[in-house]
């Protein structure tokens, strides 16, 4: 299909004068908020887990290459779409091409699903903060603690509701006074905390019952050294797909969040520079998370301990903190506070995206819209939290795993819908409106877009193919 630059918004009239009245005050506010959305719980447990599983430095190298090519392309697309149209995902895609309005609806459904369970995870983290605040760190290290907590109807729902209300309060206060102000405070504090814990992790040393001494620096070497043992073409493709799926978890792309945040930025903000800053911040936090977690796990539990998946944060790390000297309680508290900051800024961005779309569709004001959505998602969070007790079910997922309600929502939104949306978005930009539709917005006001050649190639040829493969793999149709 030939490129077509004659669609309604392609000429620029749709977006040049549609900037929203209430938005970020400037580039710093936007970058902090966008980075806050990107830096989530996935950076803290999933990235270190995949690095340990997929060859350490080999995974890191592949991830970095994909972030600054593949991730850069998707992030540029979402932010430019938002600013050029001045609209949220549902109406933004309609402005690009009326025949593709269905893509906006699909994109909107992703945060709608994610919001049902994100406050539940935030509630889990909040529970651990309370445990460490009250000096019960040895209790948190017990094998049954996490399971006992999530299967307790009263405890799991209470903390989910608390986290949901905190998220809603920030969104209720708007973009500038709520989201931007929150991000400007939480993100720098979180960065300082993760750097401090990472440095502390490198100083750790422990001798086990067998007399083997392991150090944090040895754990760092395990983390950063590329491991090519047993590497085959099939294994390399698995690592590649793992790295690409992590980018979805990490950069908040293909879920409408960056379109919404893009619609809030002013025309004098340099999109290209902002994107590089977001990528550096997000990737830096992921790398530091690995530097913090892998050496800590390695010192006290060895290589075997690093194979834990989602349980790493809530089961493995509390054991590590309990094994530390007197500082274990305080390190554990600092870690979970940092994790709460990451979860909160991400959860806020998800709820804000839903709120902004609803305000635009139904022509309602922020406060009543936020209150209504808070009621809806408080109920949804309670239902999902009870998925481990009152509403417990076992669901076979296409990837071969068995999950509960939370896992089902996560699979549909992250593993199934997001690759599909990215593929369709790339086709729309690359072959319907044309890459220059995006390039023009990035270069607006005489700004330089040095990587526009790379962007054109990625959005037209590489992203659609990779996303199609990832979609087939996630759907269980293609087994790599």
Listing of model-derived features with the role each one plays in the protein:
Residues 1-45, 74-79, 83-95, 101-102, ...:
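Membrane-interface "cap" regions at the ends of multi-pass membrane proteins
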Residues 2-4, 122-151, 262-268, 273, ...:
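Helix-loop-helix connectors at the membrane interface of multi-pass transporters/channels
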Residues 12, 17-24, 184-344, 348, ...:
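Membrane-embedded translocation segments of transport machinery
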Residues 18-21, 50-54, 87-106, 119-178, ...:
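Inter-helical loop and helix-membrane interface segments of multi-pass membrane transporters/permeases
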Residues 26-66, 256-257, 273-276, 280-283:
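Transmembrane helix-boundary motif of multi-pass solute transporters/channels
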Residues 29, 153-158, 281-287, 329-332, ...:
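Loop-to-transmembrane helix boundary motifs in multi-pass membrane proteins
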Residues 50-54, 80, 95-96, 102-115, ...:
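Membrane-water interface regions at transmembrane-helix termini and the short interhelical loops
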Residues 103, 355, 362-374, 410-467:
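C-terminal membrane-solvent junction of multi-pass transporters and transport-like membrane proteins
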